[in-house]
From Swiss-Prot:
Gene name in the database record: murB
Family statement: Belongs to the MurB family.
GO CC, alphabetical: cytosol
InterPro entries in UniProt: FAD-bd_PCMH, FAD-bd_PCMH-like_sf, FAD-bd_PCMH_sub1, FAD-bd_PCMH_sub2, MurB, MurB_C, MurB_C_sf, Oxid_FAD_bind_N
A single MF term (Gene Ontology): FAD binding
FAD-binding PCMH-type domain residues: 15-185
Cofactor(s) the protein requires to work: FAD
Keyword Repeat: no
Name of this protein: UDP-N-acetylenolpyruvoylglucosamine reductase
Main function: Cell wall formation.
Main location (coarse class): cytoplasm
Enzyme Commission code: 1.3.1.98
GO annotation terms (biological process): cell division; cell wall organization; peptidoglycan biosynthetic process; regulation of cell shape
Reaction(s) this enzyme catalyzes, per UniProt: UDP-N-acetyl-alpha-D-muramate + NADP(+) = UDP-N-acetyl-3-O-(1-carboxyvinyl)-alpha-D-glucosamine + NADPH + H(+)
Length: 344
């Protein structure tokens, strides 16, 4: 238990924020007990993994519970590998664990920061692959009554960086473990960036893993050097008519057709076209290598990051008439606040 302690080491933006209390839990019963104790005392409660997708705007006037649930189990049948990983396991370490056992499938999701329990919330994705493709179940606890239950993939209502855990199960519930189902008949996903150079007939999952790690390491800043939360904005999805108008004005715009007929745009490219790389407000800046990443360049505050995000959204809106939506969760004094509203 840590009283009135800095949250700086508990989130990757490394902003100067404190919490009344920080408790690392290693069992589900401890999580339930501490959550109920804080709730009875009318204390706000925030459950964190590695804090890789949060922005603290102020000191948190409540209790922060840090997920340290550990353990990975594996079984298999003729066609599939089944993995159950506890919510506090590091996601990238899990990807490495699967590859060490010659289990392919997760290699495109290498080096995504955070813990396993956060993966379903965001439906994390990268390089043409999303978490939902491998989700077998998500194990959840109702913190109010201690009931533990599983949701299958359909019940998770996955969308682009979205799930039921951002809505119906946002409050009073916690993800304690995740079940993955990985086919033994592996098909590589090579339709993104430099992965297209590989042949589907000869490439190995380890080669894809190494390439993805190299790409991410070259483009994304190390949080220990410059605090950040990875991609700050989602890639916007627009209808085909709107896209046609934008493409007429900007023929070179990169785009990704979606199965439903809509078009996904590259948020980083849009920001870059607004000449915002390196743009700075206080200690917060747009990263010079990857415009989609906002960084804590020099002792930034949460409010400075918000101001920077506001400017980015406004410039992109003005130039392209496209709305960027924050991917990062904004945490105020007593809990999550509306990132859309605060950066409008």
């Amino acid at each position: 238990m840590i009283m009135n302690h800095s949250l700086l080491p508990f989130h990757t933006f490394h902003l100067p924020a404190c919490a009344n209390q920080i408790i690392e839990f290693t069992t589900v019963s401890q999580l339930i007990t501490e959550w109920q104790k804080a709730t009875r005392a009318d204390q706000a409660v925030l459950i964190l993994g590695q804090g890789s997708n949060v922005l603290f705007l102020d000191d948190f006037n409540g209790v922060v519970l840090v997920n340290k649930l550990k353990g990975i189990q594996h079984r298999e049948d003729h066609d599939y590998h089944y993995i159950q990983a506890q919510g506090g396991e590091n996601w990238h370490n899990l990807v490495e664990w699967t590859l060490a056992k010659n289990i392919a499938g997760l290699e495109n999701l290498a080096l995504i920061p955070g813990v396993v329990g956060s993966a379903p919330i965001q439906n994390i994705g990268a390089y043409g692959v999303e978490f939902e493709q491998f989700c077998d179940f998500v194990e959840v606890v109702n913190l109010a009554n201690g009931q533990i239950f599983r949701l299958d993939k359909q019940a998770c209502q996955f969308g682009y960086r979205d799930s039921v855990f951002k809505h119906q199960y946002r409050h009073s519930f916690a993800i304690i473990s995740v079940g993955l189902k990985l086919a033994k008949a592996w098909t590589p996903t090579l339709n993104y960036g430099s992965l297209v150079k590989f042949s589907a007939d000869t490439v190995t999952s380890q080669q894809i893993f190494d390439e993805v790690c190299a790409i991410r390491s070259s483009k994304l800043p190390d949080p220990d050097e410059y605090g950040n939360a990875g991609s700050f904005f989602k890639n916007p999805i627009i209808d085909a008519t709107t896209f046609a108008e934008i493409q007429t004005a900007f023929p070179q715009i990169p785009y990704y057709p979606q199965p439903d007929g809509n078009i996904k745009l590259a948020a980083g490219w849009l920001i870059d076209q607004c000449e915002l790389k390196g743009f700075q407000i206080g200690g917060a800046a747009v990263h010079t290598q990857q415009a989609l990443v906002l960084i804590n360049k020099a002792h930034a505050t949460g409010r400075q990051v918000v101001e920077l995000a506001q400017q980015v959204r406004r410039r992109v809106r003005h130039k392209f008439n496209v709305e960027l939506h924050p991917e990062v969760r904004f945490i105020g004094q007593t809990g999550e606040v509306d990132s859309e509203e605060i950066t409008r």
